[in-house]
Swiss-Prot record:
Matching PANTHER family: RIBOSOMAL PROTEIN L25/GLN-TRNA SYNTHETASE, ANTI-CODON-BINDING DOMAIN-CONTAINING PROTEIN (PTHR33284), RIBOSOMAL PROTEIN L25_GLN-TRNA SYNTHETASE, ANTI-CODON-BINDING DOMAIN-CONTAINING PROTEIN (PTHR33284:SF1)
Similarity comment: Belongs to the bacterial ribosomal protein bL25 family. CTC subfamily.
MF terms in GO: 5S rRNA binding; structural constituent of ribosome
CDD domains: Ribosomal_L25_TL5_CTC (cd00495)
Function recorded in the entry: This is one of the proteins that binds to the 5S RNA in the ribosome where it forms part of the central protuberance.
Organism of provenance: Methylobacterium sp. (strain 4-46)
Record-given protein name: Large ribosomal subunit protein bL25
One Pfam family cited in the UniProt record for this chain: Ribosomal_L25p
GO BP of this protein: translation
Amino acid sequence: MSAVKPLEAVARDRVGKGAARAVRRQGRVPAVIYGGGQSPQSISLDANQTHHLIYGGGFLSTVFEIAVDGRTIRAIPRDYQLDPVKDTPLHVDFLRVVSGQTIEVEVPVHFVNQDAAPGLKQKSGTLNVVLHTITLAVSPDAIPDAVNVDLTGKDIGDTVHVSDLVLPTGASLALAPSETVATLVPPTKLGADVEAEEAAVAEAARAGSAAEAAKEG
């Protein structure tokens, strides 16, 4: 389960493009907390910390305890905007987390026990991943860091479907059970195979050159 993370914020009285630009000049990122049947709360966040949180992974599936004006607001990021040139954060939207509420979050899919998959370990097959993330409808208190797929015993030609995933208690998926998560496919020509093929081509070229030289002689 993802841990709730603390996050310091400063309340903003002014909103709009001009106010947002002024906030960014101060090394901060404008943000808003909305939902939960309450009025939106405009805040600003430290720009460096926000950058690290976004690029650290799992940002949109992490619940934060946001400290502002002497109180804390539990919220989860719903969206963020980046500068198209610098890739720095421009704005963040947070959704208030309400007790008993179910929310949709996107979490990564991790593939475990690959060494125990004969199709990968013994037969040098390739894991063709179709879904790197999945969207869960889950309680904010039960958001997992990832959904693990156990590859033990999987062979070439096997397929992992959405129905094979083990989900947290109370969580559900917005995908069809038959949808493909990953497949194990046969190995392709790599490494030694490519080198052997190149050597054969070079040998054929040398033989051809020798034959031409013999004709001219």
